[in-house]
């Protein structure tokens, strides 16, 4: 059965994303897959298949799929910078929900080191969105795709997370926003809902939905639900912020 034919029938329990409630996540994901199936097939399903940043990886981030607008010069920088990145410190299947910022020298800290390997040396016009779209393909359960839309959508929650974490870990008190932690808290708070969502998608009879249920991370499903919670076009200008 096709995606459109199953949309009206699917139902799963509500999930909150950055304080916004998606009342029928299964329908929202089916709608996303209907509208952006090419992105899922040509970008998401290539995640975790690369051992290094390559030309093929960069091409997957560009239009018509993710619209990263990474130039040839920037692509060369990503590829070169990737050769010295600390990939070995982070398992391929690392999950954001395990990246507790209060755990010193834990997954959060290792992910931050990997992020900063690119962030601290970035050339002009390479900022949060471009880096996150590349790192997502290398570690899809860990790095959110922080384009300008998702950054704005999570801003209030990220500020609250920063205040809370900063009060408990002095080394992180300097940050005004912690987007990773805000998203991580939503994943932890929605584990049951996400599990049911996967079960529903897996029984739709729609091949793309069934593959999505098996292959997409909780992080990416939540990203898709963010669009359903507050639909609209993102500002196309990448924002230069540190998202961790």
Task: Label each PLM-derived region with a short phrase.
Residues 1-122, 140-244:
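An N-terminal alpha-helical hairpin/helix-loop-helix interaction module that forms a charged
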């Amino acid at each position: 059965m096709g995606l459109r034919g199953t949309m009206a029938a699917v139902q799963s329990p509500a999930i909150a994303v950055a304080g916004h409630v998606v009342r029928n996540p299964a329908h929202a994901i089916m709608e996303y897959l209907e509208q952006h199936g090419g992105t899922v097939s040509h970008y998401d399903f290539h995640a975790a298949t690369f051992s290094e940043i390559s030309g093929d990886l960069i091409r997957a981030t560009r239009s018509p799929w993710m619209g990263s607008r990474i130039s040839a010069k920037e692509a060369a920088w990503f590829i070169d910078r990737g050769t010295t990145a600390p990939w070995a410190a982070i398992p391929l299947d690392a999950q954001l929900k395990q990246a507790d910022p209060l755990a010193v020298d834990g997954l959060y800290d290792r992910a931050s080191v990997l992020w900063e390997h690119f962030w601290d040396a970035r050339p002009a016009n390479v900022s949060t969105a471009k880096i996150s779209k590349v790192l997502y393909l290398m570690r899809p359960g860990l790095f959110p795709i922080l384009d300008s839309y998702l950054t704005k959508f999570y801003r209030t929650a990220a500020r609250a997370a920063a205040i809370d974490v900063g009060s408990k870990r002095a080394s992180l008190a300097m940050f005004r926003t912690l987007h990773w932690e805000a998203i991580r808290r939503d994943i932890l708070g929605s584990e049951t809902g996400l599990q049911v969502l996967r079960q529903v998608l897996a029984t739709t009879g729609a091949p793309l939905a069934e593959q999505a249920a098996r292959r997409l991370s909780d992080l990416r499903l939540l990203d898709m639900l963010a669009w359903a919670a507050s639909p609209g076009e993102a500002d196309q200008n990448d924002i230069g912020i540190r998202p961790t």
